[in-house]
Design a protein with these regions (language model features):
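Long, contiguous binding/interaction regions
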Residues: 1-198
């Protein structure tokens, strides 16, 4: 869960694209906005409407993939489902979007095409910041542990590393962490560090 324009949002994306994007010749982005008919009070999809929104997404993406378009991600927020796809055939892709969405006459939608050579929408909007990314990876670890029957309530030792630019900051943090019940195993000045980290 995150926020878009200070409103609750759910973003799902293809993280693997970060290693290869921008993909050569895929210079145009298709943005498809579908208005939800029954969103929750916070603008996300309701349990009742979720299955049909999945059907809409599947229909659109499956058609666009026949052109080898690249699905980048979705956003659910403010009563809308947004789909983002990169294409090298913008006109054909737009036609396929329209065909796919005709199957859902009860839904209002809008489709637009824009040049996005650097994949800005992917890297600057869909892709998570460092903290969100770490939360996603932590969630993935927890899910894997649960699948393997791990007892998540079992206490276990966890190591943390902190870096400081001054000895004063180090000492203040050490004092506070000890007050919170943490054990400090070591603290020392880093050797061969140009920035004098502690």
């Amino acid at each position: 869960m995150c926020r878009v324009d200070d409103k609750p949002a759910s973003i799902r994306l293809n993280l693997a694209l970060s290693d290869i994007a921008p993909v050569e010749d895929y210079n145009h982005r298709i943005s498809i906005f579908i208005k939800m008919n029954n969103p929750t009070e916070n603008g996300l999809s309701s349990n009742e409407e979720y299955p049909i929104l999945c059907d809409i997404e599947d229909e659109v993406i499956n058609r666009l993939e026949t052109l080898e378009d690249i699905f980048a991600g979705t956003v659910k927020s403010q009563g809308r489902l947004e789909l983002y796809v990169f294409t090298k055939n913008p006109e054909k892709s737009e036609e396929l979007c329209k065909e796919a969405l005709k199957k859902f006459p009860d839904y209002q939608w809008n489709c637009s095409i824009a040049e996005d050579v650097k994949w800005d929408i992917y890297f600057n909007f869909l892709y998570p910041d460092i903290y969100s990314y770490k939360a996603m990876m932590n969630r993935s670890v927890i899910e894997n542990l649960m699948k393997q029957g791990d007892n998540l309530e079992k206490e276990r030792e966890i190591d943390h590393w902190l870096y400081f630019y001054s000895e004063e900051s180090l000492n203040l943090a050490t004092k506070k962490l000890k007050e919170l019940g943490y054990n400090i195993l070591s603290s020392k000045k880093m050797e061969n560090e140009a920035d004098d980290s502690y």
